[in-house]
Structure formats: C-alpha cells, structure tokens
Amino acid sequence: MSAKRKSFDEALAQKDVDHLTLEEAPEELERLAAEIEKHDKLYYQKDAPRISDAEYDTLRRRNEAIEARYPELVREDSPSHRVGAQPADGFGKVVHKVPMLSLSNAFDDEDVRDFALRIRRFLNLKEEDILPITAEPKIDGLSAALRYEKGKFVMGATRGDGREGENVTENLKTIGDIPAELKGKNIPDVVEVRGEVYMSHEDFAALNERQREAGKPVFANPRNAAAGSLRQLDAKITASRPLRFFAYTWGEMSDLPADTQSGVMDAFRKWGFTVNPLFGRCDTVEALIDFYHDIEERRATLGYDIDGVVYKVDRLDWQNRLGFVSRSPRWALAHKFPAEQAMTVLEKIEIQVGRTGALTPVARLTPVTVGGVVVSNATLHNADEIERLGVRPGDTVVVQRAGDVIPQIVRVVEDRPRGKKKFVFPDTCPECGSHAVREVNPKTGKLDAVARCTGGLVCPAQAVERLRHFVSRNAFDIEGLGEKQIAAFFEDGLIKKPDDIFTLAARDAKSLKKLKDREGWGATSARKLFDAIDARREVELDRFIFGLGIRHVGETNARLLARSYGTLDHFEEQMRAAADREDEAYAELLSIDGVGEVLAESIVDFFAEKHNREVLDGLREAGVKGVPLPKQETSSPVAGKTVVFTGSLEKMTRSEAKARAEQLGAKVAGSVSAKTDILVAGADAGSKLAKARELGIEILDEDQWIELAG
C-alpha cells in the first residue's frame, strides 16, 4: 500500500467515535487535522485532489463527531474552524473583508428536514408560517470574488483559505460571463459578487483534444481544468481557455439592492451576470427535496459538473438573525449527491474495435453501484492510460462517474496479490488479425495514444460500426435500419458493405428465406424497410460524404467538401490525383478554409485504399447518388461570411439556423476565430461570446439574426 493511501486509510480505520476514550480522542483529532490539512492543500493550492469528495467529507464528519463528543478537546487549528487552504505563492494576496465560508452538508432527505426544523425553531416560526428557501445547483468549480467600485470591475480573487485568497484579477477579466462594467442604474458604490468559475463538458472535451494535438498533458476533469486555467501566471493562457462564471452570492456590499436572496439574484442578472437558470424558490421542505431529486435526475444533461444542491433562507433579515456557526452560515445548506466513486475488482480487460479502427481497452468490473447507477464496465482509453494507472486484471480499483461521462478507473488500490501479470496491449486486431499500429501525429511528431487496426472494411468490427454510421441520422438516415438491424443483417450475411443495403430487396425477392418470414419481421415491416431504402438512393452530397466514415470528416467538413467539389465523381477524381501529395489537387484540398494537414491526409488515404474505392463503385452500380448541394445565394448580406451560433435559440432549432445560413451563402463554423464574421448569440451564451467580444466580432441576438436572414 502506498504512503499516500496509507495515511488516509489509517485515519478511517480507527474505532467508532462512540467507543473512543478521552485518552484516545486527542491523538485521533491530531491525525485527522493533519490529514484534512494535507488534502486541503492538494485540492485548493495544487488542483490535484487524491481522494474523492465523499472520502473527504467522511474525514470531516468524523472530526466533527469527535469534537461534539469531547468539546473540551477542540483544537485551535481544528478543521472545523478552517475553510480551504492558504493561498499558494505566485499571486498577490487579497484579504476578504467578508470571509468566504463553506457550507454545512446534508447527505440525505432527513438532513434537509432537520435543517428546516432547526431554522423554524431558531426563528420561533409557527407551523402555518411559510419558510421560503432558495435552491440552486451546486457548481463543481473554483470559487471567486469580484469587486466592483462605481460599477467597474477593479479586483478579483480566489477563495484561498476563506480569509485570504489570490489576486487573479487579470485572469478573471478574460472570462466573458464577468462584465467589465455593471449595467443599469442605482448600482451600489461597492459591490462584491461571488460565484463559481467552471468549464462545460463540451468545452472541456475540446480543450483536452487541443492539448492532445499539441502533445500536452490532458486535464483529469473540468474542475481541475478550470482551476488550472484560472491560476495561470500568464493571463493570455487563461484567455485561451473556455471558462465560465455563475454568480450566486455576495461579500461586501455598500447597499443591498433587495431584501431577499432571490431579489439580489434578480439584480445580478440585470447588472450583467449569469445566474444559474435553474435557480428557484421553494416554500416547503418537501418542495426542496423534490427540487433536489429533479436536479439529480437532470444532472447528466446539464452540460457542466455539479455535486449537489444549495439551499438558502430567502429573507435577508432572517439570514441576519440566524447568523453563523463555526465555518458556515446557519441559514444555508449544501445537499450533496451520493458518492460518484466506489471500489470494485477489475475482472479482465477486453479490447473493442471502433468504426475508425481504434482499439479501445474496456475494463470489465465486478458490478458496483456508483452514484446510484450500477457500473460493470469502464473505459481505459488506451495503452498509455493502462500504463499510467499501473492497472492489472484482478486489481481492486476506484471507479468514478461524472454526469453522463462513461465510467472510468481513477486509481488502483495498492494491495495487489503477488503474481498478477501486467496487461500486454495487443499489436494485432482481435477481430480480424490485421496489424494494429500507432500513427505519428503530423502536428507533434509523436505517436498517437490510440492504436488502430489497419484492416479497414475487411475488419468485421469496423464494418459493422461503419455500416451503422452509414445509415445514421446525419448520413443516409434510413428509417427502420438501426443499430440492431445492421448487426443482425451483418451476422446473417445479408449486409456486409454499404451497397448491400440497396440490393437487399432484389436479393430478398430471389431468396428462399424471405425477410418477412424472419423473427421480428412481417410483410408490412419488410415492405416499409425496402421503401425507406429506395427513398434514400439519392441524398445530398454532404450526407453521402459524411456517410463514408472518413476519419476526421464530420458534418461540417463534409459540407465544405461537397461545396468545394460539387459532385462525387469530381471529388473522388481529385482525391485520387492528390495521392502523391505533389499534384496541384493536394494543394487545392489544403487551400479549402477549414481543411488542415491532418484532415487532408485522412481523406487522401481513404481514396488510396482499393477496398474503399470498391465501396464507391458498388454504390454507383446500385444506383446510389450524391446530389449536388443547391447553389448558395450570393446577394444576401451574409454571403461569403463565416457565422457561428452559440447559446440556446428559441424561435428555431440550431439545425434550422445553420441550414438557413448556408442557404444564404454563409459558411457555418463551430468555433470562434479571427476568421469569424458574425456570432449569433442565444440565451446562456458562454465562452464563444466572450471570445467574440475580445476579437471585436459582430454579435447578433436571435431576433437580429432572423431580421438579417429574412
């Protein structure tokens, strides 16, 4: 067992608090104080926690329980008197005039009922008196305080140890959700807004992808990414990171704009801050509990990490009467979600082969409940990750879930029995026996982390996944031909390659075993499938190209290629000409705005493979066509311009907005850059809006876009 785990496990292994003697308790409190201080520094200063929130809460609860049993033993340096950790070196120090305290925790519904009951008793409320309490998701990010004087942002700081934080003003100025100047009238002379700096799941994934492409380390989770980004000594690095901010409370305020918590949040919105749209107010404790469970169910769909729900008494005069206890306010409570980590046994490691030939190791686990969900599989990503974790079949491991993210192994519990052998990553594909290779990334010159099968469509696993992709919604979109049907038809030999789909009806007519006679099928369902297939013999060229499953070619790139080359025949002809990389055709491909070297190499390699060309020939013989896209308008005000959409649109779907923009001759991009001409910002726009402002790009709201688009 490693030293870092040993100290934690020893602290938890002590006897029950009820059985601790007066002689034993001081030693246990000393050990817990040291352990909690160590993990505070790892979390708040180094952004590198080694234990889960649940494990940390267990340490604190044990410390508090011992202090409650023996109040005369409470130490001056007790963790119950402390919030966070002292600021690290590297930034100037900022003293919080109003301490940034943490919240007391609730771990079940009964704790919430007790919280409401304690408040009622303290305030001497009658049974019929309404106790309004606000509720909002507890964001898993980094706390920050923003000071405004005469409406202008003058200083920002991290929480630090609650009394003294780090001056990160310049870094906070780069976050789009943080206004440089407050909007509206009657703004107090001094305003200190507090909230959470965080990173969305989408932005986190994109950041890690950029890190990988640049050969840099990836971040473990969005919180670490947000914390590491905010605490950069170079504000330019922070500016390049997609950070966001939710406002949820205040510190020093020369004059309050309302007499309720919810009223102050309304003022924050008017001043230009983003308040969580799920913020609400409840008049009964059961409504609070319903709110919590509703958020818990929606957690995976929010797009950012949360670890619970925060409750606050709404009336500020009642907050003042309730006051504080130790390190937390008596009028607020954090209702934490169940632990999202658990220990289990890794029974074996299996290799799955994806559509692009990627060999992905999957951990098969002894089933365990993690955050209310039974988990039996977890991703191990690639060979490098297996090596980094040092994981072997038979190990006891810690498994983590985060929202809708695939469960993953975060560490090995190092009490491995002797004789456990290392897992050897295969150098051949387990499905077809072809060589599995790690390609050289042309940008970094380093080997890719992912090994890929070289078998292409010869590989059964790739073939099935590519067929599923071919019929998917954004490709050929064949109704009635879903994942299960593709897998079954492939196994029975009915569909092995894309053109087999379009000859299925003709072959079925000659077959002794008709589709209608197969289990789960009938005459009507078979006829509907054949009709659906016939209806998709002609699709837009971008759908056709996307359906081919060329590595790195997504919907946007497929549309770019369709616009640039016009017809499938011309596209294929030019890609084959580009094979030697010296032909003008290769230079022309690279000249397309949005096509880089990696994408160009992938496209040319696809057409260089004989079996891929045979697929295209087969589709032509089956009468399948890629229809050229309609000509774009050239006289519209957005023709030739690059447009980016962000936030939630209310009067049209994102797909409708993109389609209209392209119809008007605009190029729709997925990210903001110096080449962007227009950003259309819907509700809850985030980092893209901030970057557009920074670059001086024209910004339109939804109504302005509709007026422009006509």
Curated annotation (Swiss-Prot):
It is an enzyme of class 6 (ligase). It catalyses: NAD(+) + (deoxyribonucleotide)n-3'-hydroxyl + 5'-phospho-(deoxyribonucleotide)m = (deoxyribonucleotide)n+m + AMP + beta-nicotinamide D-nucleotide. PROSITE patterns: BRCT, DNA_LIGASE_N1, DNA_LIGASE_N2. Its cofactor is Mg(2+); Mn(2+). Zn(2+) binds at residues 429, 432, 453, 459. Keywords: DNA damage, DNA repair, DNA replication, Ligase, Magnesium, Manganese, Metal-binding, NAD, Zinc. It comes from the Bacteria. The active site is at residue 138. GO terms for cellular component: cytosol. GO terms for molecular function: DNA ligase (NAD+) activity; metal ion binding. Pfam families: BRCT (PF00533), DNA_ligase_aden (PF01653), DNA_ligase_OB (PF03120), DNA_ligase_ZBD (PF03119), HHH_2 (PF12826). Residues 633-710 form the BRCT domain. Its EC number is 6.5.1.2. SMART domains: BRCT (SM00292), LIGANc (SM00532). NAD(+) binds at residues 53-57, 102-103, 136, 159, 196, 312, 336. The keyword Cell cycle does not apply. One of its GO terms (biological process) is DNA repair. HAMAP family: DNA_ligase_A. Belongs to the NAD-dependent DNA ligase family. LigA subfamily. NCBIfam families: dnlj (TIGR00575), PRK07956.1 (NF005932). DNA ligase that catalyzes the formation of phosphodiester linkages between 5'-phosphoryl and 3'-hydroxyl groups in double-stranded DNA using NAD as a coenzyme and as the energy source for the reaction. It is essential for DNA replication and repair of damaged DNA. This is DNA ligase.
